[in-house]
A protein has these predicted regions:
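Glycine-rich phosphate-binding loop of actin/hexokinase-like ATP-binding domains
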Residues: 31-37, 85-91, 281-407, 487-527
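Charge-patterned, long linear interaction tracts outside catalytic cores
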Residues: 232, 266-309, 546-587
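C-terminal, non-catalytic interaction/recognition modules in large multi-subunit enzymes and RNPs
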Residues: 3, 11, 145-149, 153-156, ...
């Protein structure tokens, strides 16, 4: 059979979402299956077989698989970074302890702040003599004997995951490579990451932590990707059986090695990266740090693609899950990027889509603060035991319980697969209401109001920090709980409207199929604009472009299918932060450098409200050069929807729903709605993986692509 179906598989903490796209027709098929945190490969393969069974196809029909995984993220968020060691310069053993000497926002009095545990305790930090100057020249030679001694120290104590970060190795990596060679000789079973390969950028604290995060997640990610790659290879040739039953393992893997990842396979397998691109499994195992936010990145990209097709180039996205809500901003069809992200308590300076996360998901717990006020989140009931209405042992009221009590979601989820216990949810809300002195309805409505404001604050944060006005944006909501508070957010934020895509609960999996192969490269090269030599800048970009080209060649992209994008980090001399600006194509000349400086002034004003263009004393300083290498993949177009026959044909009845009061709300099956159909609230639009409560005074119109466009009525 000709391979014509591409699959996107997004593994979340609760569900694994799968989207299948036929490359010729653009037809979509979607499904969900419970995730299997103890062995994520089981849920992955079960979901894959489920969608293929729906289509009546076998593995020989699959042309490629793109995957978003939480393996790396979960290891960090759960604090599972044990058995990790660190090697740095002699005299810098307290680099991680000192960190940035800063206290997080919200702790005005530092006496109340408890410093979190460092990623590596100081007793597992070893130092080696040897020192490079800021320009890469050698001040003291690398001490091979001491390096050997330290490698044996790690080996004798069974510390087999090690990060190496030496000062100024972003300029000259010879000392770090020498340390890796010593570790390979003396401790051959160790997994090693060196900072000059993970992050070739200055600021040693962030570079060290990013390198250690890379090392910490590398063993798990390698084993996981190797297992999936082996199963996909078997599937492609018809040797793989059905999805493994729960509790079983899909096959053996070898710690620290990835033979099945590196081997040739008839089925291309890509893994989503945090920067908005994908990378083949064989390459991504050497860049595990790049996958830490792959799930939220895929959702933001999928939302950007759907919004662009619908005619919206500027949107904010809201991905509502069970534990949290992720928001980001899309300008001119591109999600915003950052290198200032954090994963849990750990700074990660690799490029990633800028996502703000707030603990306001469907499972977020409502509670009474010591001050007597109602709070929602960040603590969550998660999937186990889950909200009270799941009847799995949960006793604390959650956002989902409030929705159930107010009739805003049906008494079942996933098309009836998950029945909900409305009475138990009401009991949990009643208990909280009695503490607050409120009625059940007022308490449940209050829980949703607090949750809506938590989400609104995150949306303001992601826009205002960039000098943007959230009122200029349309919001795209997706995820299982993403659309539940859409109408309230329109009022709170003054939004123009909301776009609810087709299959919103599977949009992250769809987003996996809309992206290209992408690698990012950086080189710190600090110089003031007045002394900047175009030849030096040209040489720097040429070296980065060569590295990007080599990586694309390994991915199988010929020279005529490689795209390169240049950017630079600039600042005013004396500042401690940079602004990234695009560097146009073409020869690096004085004129081009001047145009980049002009763009920096404009961007600085947009972000901070001022620039120093007219003040010659405020000199522009170049800090880092960046190149992104992009290999375009075939991506699906957004299919158009069939014309509807009127919203009444999709009506399934009515029920009492509480908005500002109890009202009769019409119910609609979204599968039966077509382009041009329009619904006026109060109403509830239900589908397999999501629900949209449409408040009184709002309309929802189905556009040409099947999206629901929600706006407040003109009157």
């Amino acid at each position: 059979m000709t391979r014509r179906v591409r699959l996107g598989v997004d593994t979340g903490g609760t569900f694994t979402d799968v989207v299948a796209v036929h490359e010729d027709t653009g037809d979509l098929a979607v499904t969900k299956t419970p995730s299997t945190p103890s062995d994520p490969a089981v849920g992955f393969m079960t979901g894959l077989h489920k969608v293929l069974d729906t289509l009546g196809l076998g593995g020989d029909a699959v042309s490629g698989v793109s995957h978003g995984t939480t393996v790396a993220t979960n290891r960090l968020l759960e604090g599972r970074v044990e058995n990790l060691g660190f090697v740095t310069n002699d005299g810098y053993e307290f680099l991680l302890e000192i960190a940035r000497q800063s206290v997080p926002d919200g702790y005005g009095n530092s006496y109340f702040w408890v410093k979190p545990d460092r990623i590596v305790p100081v007793d597992r930090v070893r130092t080696v003599r040897g020192r490079l100057a800021v320009d890469g020249s050698e001040i003291h030679p690398f001490d091979l004997d001491q390096a050997t001694e330290q490698a044996r120290w790690f080996r004798d104590r069974g510390i087999d995951t090690i990060g190496v970060c030496f000062l100024h190795s972003y300029v000259d990596d010879s000392h770090e490579r020498a340390m890796r060679d010593v570790l390979a000789r003396e401790h051959p079973g160790a997994t090693v990451s060196i900072s000059s390969e993970v992050l070739r950028e200055y600021r040693e604290y962030e570079r060290a932590v990013t390198t250690l995060v890379d090392a910490a997640v590398k063993p798990d990610l390698r084993r996981y990707v190797a297992t999936i790659a082996t199963r996909l290879s078997q599937l492609a040739v018809g040797q793989e059986g059905g999805g493994s039953p729960p509790g079983t393992h899909p096959g053996p893997s070898t710690a620290g090695t990835t033979p099945s990842v590196r081997s040739e396979s008839p089925l291309p397998f890509y893994v989503m990266k945090s920067n908005g691109g994908v990378l083949s499994a064989g390459e991504v195992v050497d860049q595990p740090i790049s996958t830490v936010l792959s799930g939220p990145a895929a959702g933001a990209l999928g939302a950007a693609v759907v919004a662009a097709a619908a005619g919206f180039s500027q949107v904010v996205t809201l991905d509502g899950g069970g534990t949290s809500t992720d928001v980001t901003v899309v300008v001119d069809g591109q999600p915003a990027l950052t290198t200032e992200g954090t994963i849990g308590a750990f700074p990660c300076k690799v490029p990633m889509i800028d996502v703000v996360t707030v603990g306001a998901g469907g499972g977020s717990i409502a509670w009474l603060s010591p001050e007597g006020t109602l709070k929602v989140g960040p603590r969550s009931a998660a999937a186990d035991p889950g909200p009270v209405c799941y009847a799995r042992g949960g006793v604390e009221p959650t956002v989902t319980d409030a929705h159930v009590v107010l009739g805003r979601i049906p008494p079942h989820l996933l098309g009836g697969e998950v029945p909900l216990d409305v009475a138990s949810a009401a009991g949990a809300i009643d208990a909280l209401a009695s503490e607050l002195g409120l009625t059940r309805d007022a308490c449940a409505a209050g829980v949703l109001e607090v949750s809506a404001w938590n989400q609104a604050n995150a949306l303001r944060q992601v826009t205002v920090e960039r000098g943007l006005d959230v009122r200029d944006f349309t919001m795209v909501t997706f995820g299982g709980s993403g659309s539940l508070l859409a109408c309230r957010l329109v009022d709170v934020l003054g939004l123009d409207g909301v776009l609810v895509p087709v299959n919103p609960g599977n949009l992250s999996a769809y987003g996996l199929l809309t992206v290209d192969v992408r690698n990012d490269y950086v080189q710190t090269a600090v110089a003031r604009a007045s002394t900047l030599d175009p030849a030096v800048v040209r040489a720097g970009y040429d070296a980065l472009t060569e590295r990007a080209a080599e990586a694309l060649a390994r991915e199988g992209f010929p020279s005529d299918r490689r795209v390169f994008e240049r950017t630079a980090d600039l600042r005013y001399f004396g500042q401690a932060y940079e602004v990234r600006v695009a560097v146009p194509e073409g020869a690096v000349t004085e004129e081009l450098l001047a145009s980049v400086a002009d763009a920096f002034h404009d961007e600085h004003r947009a972000l901070y409200g001022y620039d120093n263009r007219a003040d010659p004393r405020q000199e522009v300083e170049w800090v880092s050069l960046r190149v992104s290498g992009i290999g375009p993949l075939r991506t699906p177009s957004v299919p158009e929807a069939s014309v509807g026959g009127g919203a009444r044909s999709a009506s399934t009845g009515s029920r009492k729903v509480y908005f500002d009061d109890w009202v009769d709300a019409d119910l609609f099956d979204r599968r039966l709605l077509g382009a041009g159909d329009e619904i006026t609230g109060p109403a509830v639009v239900e589908e397999f993986s999501s629900t949209l409560p449409l408040h009184p005074g709002f309309t929802a119109r189905v556009d040409a692509y099947g999206n629901l466009v929600v706006r407040r009525c003109a009157s």
